[in-house]
Amino acid sequence: MRRAPDRPRYDAPVSDVEVAAEPVATPDRRSFVDRVRNARPWLKGLAAFVLYLALTCAIYLPPIGAAIGTRYVGDGWADARLYRWGLAWTPWALLHGHPPLFASDVFAPAGVNLTWVTFVPSLGIVSYPLQRLFGSLVTLNILMLLAPALAAWATYLVCVRATKRFWPSLLGGLFFGFSSYIAGHMVDHLNLVMIFTAPLAVYLVIRRIEGSLSPIWFVVLLTLDLVFAFGVSTELFATTTFFGAIAFVIALIFSGRDVWRVLRAGLLVAASYVMVGVLLLSFLTNALNHEPTQVLRPVDKTSIDLGSWVVPRQHTRIGGESFTNITSRFTASAQEDAGYVGIVALVMLVGFAITEWKRRSTWALLAFLAIVAVLASGSVLHILGRPTIGLPGEWLTHVPLLQHATPQRFPAYAALALGVIAAIWVSRGTGWTAWIRWVVAGLAAAAILPAPDPSAFHAYGQTPAFFTNGEVQQWIKQDEMVFSVTERPASELQWLAASGFWYQIPQAYIGPIPPEYEGQPIYRGLAVNQLNPYIPTPADFAAFLQDHGVTAVLVDDDAVWKFGPVLHAVGLVEQYQGDGVGVWRTGPAGYVAHDPAAVVMNGDIDHVGGELRAFSFPSVDGPERVRGPNHRTTLFSFYGPTCDRSCTANLQALDTWAGAHPDVRVIAVSS
């Protein structure tokens, strides 16, 4: 007797053929849910992406309104300006025959190796048309808004292969695309939020195991995915590879009769990595040869607390600012702590384990989650800030490339597994239990929804017209050595890119300073709003400018009030002022150091002999700066990014007091 063909097992992957074979309701009786359920797979995928993008915009656009061309979606601090330079650098270098991994016009004349600089070459190449059309600020904002949507969408693709259901898969994508990891790094870390390549790699592997993707296409597509990931972030490439290897071992253990299919897919993955090694040989060689001598971030200070999993941080919409008295004890900062999933998510995991305990895939997913949780805790388990038992995370600091990754970011991969678990658990519910599963999973997703960082200023990001209207070519010679004095760190890179890389600079904010420049703060440049403001002595400044052959100094109009005295003190004279920038050069005597006429203290306040002469701060209400003192007594109130709701009460009390004392100028400053 001929056997009927085997039906797919309960947890077998689903092919496009099976998805298309679902029964279709009659057109005249189809509800909206039925129409979505029976739509073509590509149309469902498009709808999912649009919904994720709409949610992203609803969360992150309100703080800046329609000002996507003038303000940053993130806080606009130094990293954002570094990315704007990086996005422009790679296309320019390729088009002009320069090696993209070496910037000769930064830290000139020696130049700087960019292997360990987050200059995001992959994003620079794919976004080149956007940069040409809209400029670097709009391009950066668009990429930042695309990142959560792409991460959620790639996770949706994974969930669809596991469930063949649209709505559960749509829900599953939320857990990764809007996770605490994404929320924290949306403050400015473009290279870290572009993590969609990780779930996309998982999707391709599932397609290969189920047989719906040919070996050749699988190797080609996975190679492209990995190369793109490496060009976005070497850290994400390393952690994706590491946790992918862990997932592969777990899959072999729990795959049962499918072990050979998993093993064959693993061999093809290895072939893809060989292709990646060939394509990126120069990049990888540079990375290993120029690897920092010390771990960039110590493990004991960059791991998560056990409480991180259930206590929300500031970037969480529900309860984010209610527990700062607890989270202030955690080792990870609010921005970097990716651990939060919430108590409801833990309830969902318990329900998943109880109802699906007979399936191998259940224990494979839970085992992966447990391993991520242990490694994210670093070398010591911290409970509400208190160190307890030792953990195996310390050995990661001895693995090349991976040793510079930080455990506090590892929970991103737990969020990916959590999204798949949510989709599977909801899709398998029947009868009244289905509603219970939907409610629990829906509440878990709602609990992690992010809010824009309350401490972010969303700075204005326009480039001075001097660099875009041709003035820079009139006042600065091509390849001239130029020192930049700016209002914010890394603006010197933004200016350089906007000029079309017209001149050279001896200093820059590029993340870690090259080893040969360590210990010399002037190599980070001079900026008004630095975290650790530095003003050199006239003698040191004059020596630096002379030793590096600097013949012109570009000064932001908003930086003159602070650095004007030291510029005059080394013999510089302003020769041009306009379009937001001044051009300063020396007289016939060259650089001659003498005592400045005023003593400038660290920060944004200029003191001379104890008397407040001038101050300048960004205004929340517009691009103008609050200046003074205008011959009035001035009272300053400084508050930091860890403020909780008590800050609001204090500020309201301060506002009431200011209204009763019109003779005193009261200014609240976010530090």
Q: Which residue stretches match the model-derived regions?
A:
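Start-transfer (signal-anchor) and selected internal transmembrane alpha helices
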Residues: 1-63, 265-274, 354, 360-368
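Extracytoplasmic
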Residues: 16, 295-297, 442-599
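Membrane-interface helix-loop-helix junctions at transmembrane boundaries of multi-pass membrane enzymes
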Residues: 39-40, 255-267, 349-390, 431-436
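Membrane-embedded helix bundles of polyisoprenyl
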Residues: 52, 143-162, 166-253, 269-277, ...
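Membrane-interface coil-to-helix junctions
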Residues: 55-151, 180-195, 303-330, 380-395, ...
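Periplasmic/ER-lumenal interhelical loops and adjacent helix-loop junctions
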Residues: 77-94, 266, 277-353, 404-407, ...
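Short active-site neighborhood of thiol/selenol oxidoreductases, capturing the structured segment around
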Residues: 625-649
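Structural microenvironment flanking redox-active thiols in thiol-disulfide oxidoreductases
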Residues: 647-671
